[in-house]
Amino acid sequence: MVEFKEYISEMNRRLKKYFPESNSLTPAEEGVFKALDIFRVPKKEADEQRYKAIKYAFKHHYENNSFYRKFCKENNVTPDDIKSIKDFNKIPLVPDQFFKTYPSGKEFAMWLATVYTGDLPSIVVKRNDDYDDIINKFNEAGLVISYSSGTSGRHTFIPRDKRTFYDAEYMIAKAVITMVYPFWEYDSYGYLLMPNPFKTNVFAGKVCGAYFDAVKDIQVAMDRELKADLIQAAMKNNLKGRIIRYAMQRENKKMIDRIINWMREHYKNGDKISFIGAPFILYFVMEELEKNGEYFDFGENGAIVTGGGWKIFEDRRISVEEFRKKAEKILGIPQENCLDLYGMVEGNGFMVQCPEGHYLHIPNTCYQAMVIDENGEEVAEGEKGRFAFLDGLAMSYPGFIISGDEVRMYEECPVCDRPTPVLEPEVKRAAGSEMRGCAEEMRRVLAMDMGGGNA
C-alpha cells in the first residue's frame, strides 16, 4: 500500500495549479496547503493555526470591506478585541439570507461590489443582461462568482476572487482524497453527478474542477450550460416550467442509461471508478439496475462521495445510511468507501465523513465551526442548534456566517481517532428555513417524474 506522505505528494503534483505562491500564503492557506493530513493536525497546533487564520481574515475584512466594518461597529467589535479563540464568538455573523437580498441589472453589479472585499473589476452592464451575463462578465475579468440554492426562486450569490476559489477547489479535493486513503489514484475513472464545472456558475458543479485534474478520465452527468434563469423557470409551475421539465425528463432517462453503460464497461475492464456529486442521481441509477435485476461488485475498486440533497422526491427522503446500504447491495461498493460531504456556497471549508463512523470531520486549521441557539449563543456539546462558521480562507467576502442548517457537534469523533471536532452524519434544515443546497436544487430541476413523485 502506498505511504500516506507519498499519496499526498502525488495529489499535490496533480493539483499544482491551485497552489498560491509559497512566499505569500495566508495563515489559513498555510493550514490547508502545508498540513499533510488536514484531519490529523494535533489539537494544540490546529488551535494556534486556526486562531491566526480567523484573526487575519477578520482584520482583512474589517479594514477592506466598508459594509462589514459598519456591521462590526454596530456590534462594537474591532480586530483588537479578538485576543484568543475564546473571543471568536464576538465576531459578528452575517445571516446566509443576506446573500439572497440582491436587486437585478446594474444594481446587482453594485450589490456585488458592496459584498466584495476589495475592488471589483469594472464591467459594462447592458440593459438586458441577466444574472449569468453579469456574472460571466465579472468572471472574464478575473473573478469566480457562483451561486446556489435557488430552491425558493432566490439564488445565493457569492463573489470569490480566483485565489479564494482555487483555495476552495484544493480544499474539497484534499479533504476527499485524504478521507478515502488509500483509494485515490490518478489512473482511474470518475463520474461527476453535477453540472459541468466549465459550463455553469452553479457552485457545486463549479467547485469540482479539481476532480478533472486529480483523475485522468471524467464523465459529467449534466454536460450542458445551466443558467440561473433556466433553473428558476424549471421550478415554476407554469407552462414554460412544465415544458422545460418535460425536456429534462427525457434527457434524464438518457443520462441514467449513459451512467449504467459506463459502469458496465469499467466493471468488465476491472477499472477503478469513483462517483462524486448529487446522491439522487445515483439513487435513480441504482433503482433502474435493481428493477432490471442487474448488480455489480466493484468492491475496493469503487468509491462514492455524495454532496447533500437527500430528498429523492418531495415526499421522500433517503437516509445517508440507507443510501450506503443500497450502494453496497447493488454496486458492491463497501460502506467505508461511500462517504458524504457537507459544505455550502457561502464557505470554503468542507466536512467529509470518516470511513470508520461516518461522522463529518471539520477541517480545524482554518475553519471555526459553531452551533448556536435562536439568541446567537453557543449551545452545549451535542445539543441541536444552527450551524455557523468563521472561514479563514474567504478573502473576497466576509465568510463569518450563520446558516439555516440544524446540526449537533462533538469535540471529538465517537468512532475514529482523528482529533477534529465532528458533526453528526445527518444535517437538516432548521424549522422555517427553505431546503438549501446545490444537490437539492439539481434534484428539483432534474428529478421531476424520474420514477414517480413530483418536485
Q: Across the structure, where does each feature detected by a protein language model lie?
A:
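Adenylate-forming
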Residues: L282-D297
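Nucleotide 5′-phosphate-binding alpha/beta core
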Residues: M1-Y147, R154-G205, D217-Q249, K253-S274, ...
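Short, aromatic/basic amphipathic alpha-helical patches
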Residues: N201-K216, L289, I318-K325
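Conserved AMP-binding/adenylate-forming
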Residues: G302, W310-C413
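Ser/Thr-glycine-rich phosphate-binding loops at phosphate-binding pockets of nucleotides
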Residues: I145-H155, M344-G347, S403
